[in-house]
Regions:
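A short local loop/turn or secondary-structure capping micro-motif enriched for an aromatic residue
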Residues: 10-11, 73-75, 156-161, 210-213
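Self-processing/autoproteolytic domain segments and adjacent N-terminal interaction modules in large
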Residues: 1-151, 165, 171-180
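Ser/Thr- and Asn-enriched, surface-exposed coil loops between beta-strands
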Residues: 155-163, 194-198
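Generic detector of ordered, mature protein regions
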Residues: 78-80, 130-132, 160, 204-206, ...
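Short, compositionally biased serine/threonine- and acidic-rich segments at solvent-exposed termini, linkers
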Residues: 173-225
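Short, charged low-complexity linear motifs
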Residues: 123-131, 162, 185-193
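Solvent-exposed serine/threonine-rich low-complexity stretches and specific carbohydrate-binding patches
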Residues: 149-157, 225
């Protein structure tokens, strides 16, 4: 695409099939000189499921962006070029294995760009262990020798299509979606404690709760421990 405008690609039906592992640039979308605004990359899989990637630059306008999205088998193969294994014990997520990853890879290349990116996947690609399938997911990136910690958030789905969004991405490469075991079962928006005479009033607000049964509030006796 020679236009980097946010309306360079629009969709009413259909989409771009990126599930091509033949190499030589096959199945990739190249956008020249990306500009501001949310950019839709309307990928579909070989079954016609709509799995868009939405990329919204926050800085670095004018960068060239190359992006692809590929379905895999449950063992996460075929791997993208440059990735030879998933189970790396020296990575930042100790013990990451094929059981922890959604069955899809994404590859993005861009230089000097910072953006918010949303990745979509089909529920059929969610082959995580049953107890993790509806948990929070995070975006992981291959560094060349290991994986970054999960970042961003989105809930796992077992029907339809799921989406996970990562903010302020400035380093690109090979991305996957992992069960985010580091995430709390709640997304906390606010927490306040106010003195009222001899008591303390505590209020909090959550944006989302997953498998959360109750809250436990603890008070320090000495203000330190």
């Amino acid at each position: 695409l020679m236009s980097g405008d946010s309306q360079a690609i629009t969709r009413t039906a259909g989409g771009i099939i990126s599930d091509d592992h033949s190499g030589s640039g096959s199945g990739r979308v190249v956008m020249k000189g990306i500009q501001s605004g949310p950019h839709l990359f309307p990928f579909i899989d070989e079954n016609g499921s709509y799995l868009p990637v939405i990329l919204q630059p926050t800085s670095g306008f004018g960068a060239d962006v190359t992006i692809s999205s590929n379905h895999t088998a449950q063992d996460n193969r075929p791997f993208p070029s440059g990735l030879s294994t998933v189970a790396v014990t020296t990575d930042l997520i100790a013990g990451l294995s094929t059981d922890n990853l959604i069955d899809r890879w994404w590859e993005i290349t861009a230089s000097g760009l910072t953006a918010n990116v949303s990745f979509s996947y089909s529920a059929l690609e969610n082959t995580l262990p049953i107890d993790l399938r509806l948990s929070y997911l995070g975006v992981v990136r291959w560094t060349g020798s290991g994986w970054t910690q999960p970042a961003g958030s989105g809930l796992g789905v077992t029907l339809g299509t799921g989406m996970v969004t990562m903010s302020n991405v400035s380093t690109f490469g090979i991305f996957g979606l992992s069960a985010n075991n580091l995430a709390l079962p709640i997304e906390l928006v606010s927490f306040e404690a106010k003195a009222k005479a001899t008591e303390v009033e505590i209020t909090w607000t959550t944006a989302a709760e997953v498998n959360n049964d109750y809250f436990v509030i603890e008070r320090s006796a000495d203000g330190r421990n």
